[in-house]
């Protein structure tokens, strides 16, 4: 017998060291030839995402072709007269309505939509498969109805945008009706604005006479309705009422939207009283009588203010009053300027008399101008202080002289609170004043109130937290840091924390319930006057002062007003340059920064500034021919 061969066992380590040869795939060979071996030192591999721009359109085209051939369609959508074969996945991908019902029951084979027109549904299905559609004012009603019902939001937006784009005088009410029916907020807002802006032309169209009472009532109540005058609004309302005798019952309610108080007494007689209905209908006649009484009682107009005395389409603008222009001994100014948002500064009117270092206030839509100086005498300004007090009405471009202040005042402050006007401190030929007096419009009288603890002038005041804050100024021949607050409810004064920097001839303004003190001058180390650039802010909530961004240009005897949440500091005298300034500096409390705005037409000191609601340009132009702009006294 032959001996058995001895089998030699290889250990585990020997097996691991064996080389296993695997034939390269064609791809690996190709990569190797180009040096693209993984982990090697060949060319680097960078992956990129590529997009086929034609893939989406091709996919839609393929799906649309499949639907036309009824290939793989798995859902039938029916209307009262017609059915459509579609793919569930396509309809569910663009319609929340189909997505929800198919998610509940994916096996559903048919959906009947009897409230949707075949035309509307066919257009929606075509849009789902192509992303395209043809719209017209004749078909959009059925299409948007289907799109809203099926919750296809992109299609609803396309329809809304189409309505806005195609807006005209002839179809604007049609757009309003569709927008209201299907809750298209953007389209409705656009249509309403279009009608407001083109109301005169719209009132001549056939669509206007078809308005319901609710629709014309909503238009005539609108503050932003663009009209040349309120007389035109009255005539348009009467035109609608007289078109159908059945509308007579709406006369008083509809005409209550006419701003009769903004029509002059002469025009009320000429154009309103001459209309028979205004004399025969008791409720309509009462509207006329109320307007007449409003004009006959000028001192009571503050308490008679209402929606019917407020101008339409008013625009809040910056207004400057008086001052001394130029670097020479030029006469004082009577001019009142306003800044049109589009056209810049223009002359609004003239004051009854020239004025310098006067104070202004706005209350109930009226501009009040008080005190100041009537002569240019730099050596003795207090000698020429006056007690004049007058009121400007921007609706009619007219002035009335009111009761003079009890004391002549210049370099004082004027504040408005709770329907009353407060004049504090200042100086005149007799010296600095501590007195405080309050103007009551209904009686046209000034009433003395508790005086300041010490006489002060060249200060600034602002209203916050129900109190009048009086800041800084000139006390006992020295610049002051002191601050005190007057409480009209208790007719008492309270000391508040001082300013960090003494100042006089400065400004104060309220922004977002905080008082900002800016500008003015103080004495430098050598006893010379220097500009104060620091700006301080008082918070009634904490009762403390803090710093805000400093001024870029120091100014004294400037004017300041708040507009759209910002402070505008205009004109003034710069001590560093010894120069009158025409700059307008704008402060944003949100950004805590100052920026240069446009300039005044002329460098001016002793100028006052306020914000006033003005009629729009069309109204201003039309009233000039019917209402005198010459100052009058009543």
Curated annotation (Swiss-Prot):
Role noted for this protein: Transcriptional repressor in MAPK/JNK signaling pathway to regulate cellular functions. Overexpression inhibits the transcriptional activities of both the TPA-response element (TRE) and serum response element (SRE).
Gene Ontology CC annotations of this record: cytoplasm; nucleus
Family matches, as SMART domains: BACK, BTB, Kelch
PTM comment text: N-terminus is methylated by METTL11A/NTM1.
GO biological process: negative regulation of JNK cascade; negative regulation of protein phosphorylation
The species this protein was found in: Homo sapiens (Human)
Record keyword Repressor present: yes
Protein name: Kelch-like protein 31
């Amino acid at each position: 017998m032959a001996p058995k061969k001895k089998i030699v066992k290889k250990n585990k380590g020997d097996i691991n060291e064996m080389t296993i040869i695997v034939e390269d795939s064609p791809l690996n060979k190709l990569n190797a030839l180009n040096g693209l071996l993984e982990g090697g030192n060949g060319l680097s591999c960078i992956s990129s995402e590529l997009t086929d721009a034609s893939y989406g359109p091709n996919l839609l085209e393929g799906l649309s072709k499949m639907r036309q051939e009824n290939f793989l369609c798995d859902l039938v959508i029916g209307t009262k007269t017609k059915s459509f074969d579609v793919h569930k996945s396509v309809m569910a991908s663009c319609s929340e309505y189909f997505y929800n019902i198919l998610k509940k029951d994916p096996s559903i084979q048919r959906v009947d939509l009897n409230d949707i027109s075949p035309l509307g549904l066919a257009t929606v299905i075509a849009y789902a498969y192509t992303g395209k559609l043809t719209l017209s004012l004749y078909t959009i009603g059925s299409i948007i109805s289907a799109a809203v019902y099926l919750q296809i939001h992109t299609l609803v937006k396309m329809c809304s945008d189409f309505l806005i784009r195609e807006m005209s005088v002839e179809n604007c009410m049609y757009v309003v009706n569709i927008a209201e029916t299907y809750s298209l907020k953007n389209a409705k807002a656009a249509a309403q604005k279009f009608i407001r802006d083109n109301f005169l032309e719209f009132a001549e169209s056939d669509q206007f006479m078809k308005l319901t009472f609710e629709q014309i009532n909503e238009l005539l109540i609108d503050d932003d309705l663009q009209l040349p005058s309120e007389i035109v609004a009255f005539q348009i309302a009467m035109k609608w009422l007289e078109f159908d005798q059945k509308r007579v019952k709406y006369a008083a309610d509809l005409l209550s939207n006419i701003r009769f108080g903004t029509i002059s007494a002469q025009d009320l007689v000429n154009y309103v009283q001459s209309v028979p209905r205004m004399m025969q209908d008791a409720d309509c006649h009462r509207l006329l009588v109320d307007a007449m009484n409003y004009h006959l009682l000028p001192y009571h107009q503050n308490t008679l203010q209402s929606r019917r005395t407020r101008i339409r389409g008013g625009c809040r603008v910056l207004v400057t009053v008086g001052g001394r222009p130029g670097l020479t001994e030029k006469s004082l100014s009577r001019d009142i300027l306003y800044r049109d948002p589009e056209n810049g500064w223009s002359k609004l009117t003239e004051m009854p008399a020239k004025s310098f270092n006067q104070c202004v206030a706005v209350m109930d839509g009226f501009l009040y101008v008080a005190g100041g100086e009537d002569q240019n005498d730099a050596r003795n300004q207090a000698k020429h202080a006056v007690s004049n007090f007058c009121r400007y009405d921007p609706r009619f471009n007219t002035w009335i002289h009111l009761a003079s202040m009890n004391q002549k005042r210049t370099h004082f402050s004027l504040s408005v609170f709770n329907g009353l006007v407060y004049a504090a401190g200042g100086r005149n030929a007799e010296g600095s004043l501590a007195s405080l007096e309050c103007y009551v419009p209904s009686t046209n009288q000034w009433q003395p109130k508790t005086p300041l603890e010490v006489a002060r002038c060249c200060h600034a005041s602002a209203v916050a937290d129900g109190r009048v804050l009086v800041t800084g100024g000139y006390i006992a021949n020295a610049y002051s840091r002191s601050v005190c607050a007057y409480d009209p409810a208790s007719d008492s004064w309270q000391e508040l924390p001082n300013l960090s920097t003494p100042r006089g001839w400065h400004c104060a303004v309220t922004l977002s319930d905080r008082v900002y003190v800016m500008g003015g001058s103080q004495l430098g180390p050598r006893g010379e006057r220097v500009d104060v650039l620091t700006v301080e802010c008082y918070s009634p909530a904490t009762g403390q002062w803090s710093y805000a961004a400093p001024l870029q240009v120091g100014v004294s005897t400037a004017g300041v007003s708040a507009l759209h949440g910002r402070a505008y500091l205009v004109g003034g005298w710069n001590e560093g340059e010894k120069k009158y300034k025409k700059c307008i500096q704008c402060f944003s409390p949100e950004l805590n920064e100052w920026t240069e705005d446009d300039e005044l037409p002329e460098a001016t000191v002793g100028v006052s500034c306020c914000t006033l609601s003005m009629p729009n340009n069309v109204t201003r132009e039309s009233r000039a021919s019917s209402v005198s702009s010459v100052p009058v006294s009543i």
